[in-house]
Regions:
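N-terminal helical cap/lid subdomain that shapes the substrate entry/recognition surface
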Residues: 2-103
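Asp-based, Mg2+/Mn2+-dependent phosphohydrolase catalytic module
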Residues: 1-7, 20, 31, 36, ...
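Glycine-centered short loops/turns at secondary-structure junctions
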Residues: 115-116, 194
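Catalytic-core regions built around general acid/base machinery
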Residues: 104-115
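Short, conserved clusters of charged catalytic residues that mark active-site
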Residues: 103-104, 159
Length: 222
């Protein structure tokens, strides 16, 4: 089998450190709302946010639906009262400006640029993801951006990946390598349409390579 020549990168926690940006945004919106904040509260955000994204990946929830319930759910878990919709808006405004690269990611893109066709494939609002890539100095590395907010479908749906391929005329699925940290959205989603896959383990847990991935890398190998 020939080596893939089109690389599709997930964005959050693959190229950009979503967790770092979200933690900073959470602290800022709590301070602005006059709510108590402690770093350990971020663990509640992570658990509840991951649950909601898992529902999106299973097709049970839309990104718009996530916005409606995310902060309402998190505040309830923390025993705090505030306007969940206003907190969501404030959180997204701050996240829009967040551009903390995953360690080594800019250098990897620089090495690959010109040798492969690089694309981004991400769930999220289009303007937000474009702005974050621009602020991180990564935007110009990409030939195409496949962002769910503009694609009208989310990973891991076949519709999302089929629409990616439709915008790459003449490219067969097996010529594409989907790289990302989500075994569901990135690895299972890419594999389902015939793409080859590379699981990025951002925590460097040293876990065994999942059977649905063709390759595995961690931060130490970026």
């Amino acid at each position: 089998m020939n080596k893939p020549n089109v690389l599709l990168f997930d964005i959050d926690n693959t190229l950009l450190d979503f967790s770092a940006g979200a933690m900073q945004a959470m602290e800022e919106i709590f301070r602005a709302a006059g709510l108590p904040y402690a770093p350990e509260m971020f663990a509640v955000f992570q658990v509840e946010n991951d649950k909601l994204w898992a529902r999106i990946e299973r097709g049970e929830l839309t990104i718009a639906g996530l916005r409606d319930v995310r902060w309402q759910t998190i505040l309830a878990r923390l025993g705090l009262e505030a306007d969940g919709a206003a907190m969501e808006d404030a959180f997204r405004d701050r996240l829009h400006e967040s551009a903390v690269p995953v360690a080594g990611a800019p250098e990897v893109l620089a090495r690959l640029h010109g040798k492969y066709r690089l694309c981004a494939a991400s769930n999220g609002p289009y303007a937000q993801q474009v702005n974050r890539l621009r602020r991180a100095g990564m935007l110009d590395a990409f030939e195409r951006l496949f962002i769910s907010g503009q694609m009208g479908a989310e990973k891991p749906s076949r519709v999302f990946f089929d629409r990616c391929l439709a915008q790459l005329p003449g490219v067969r699925p097996e010529q594409c390598l989907m790289i990302g940290d989500s075994l569901t959205a990135d690895i299972a989603g890419g594999r389902a349409v015939g793409m080859r896959t590379c699981w990025f383990d951002p925590a460097d847990r040293g876990a065994a390579m999942p059977p649905q991935a063709d390759w595995q890398i961690g931060r130490a190998h970026v």
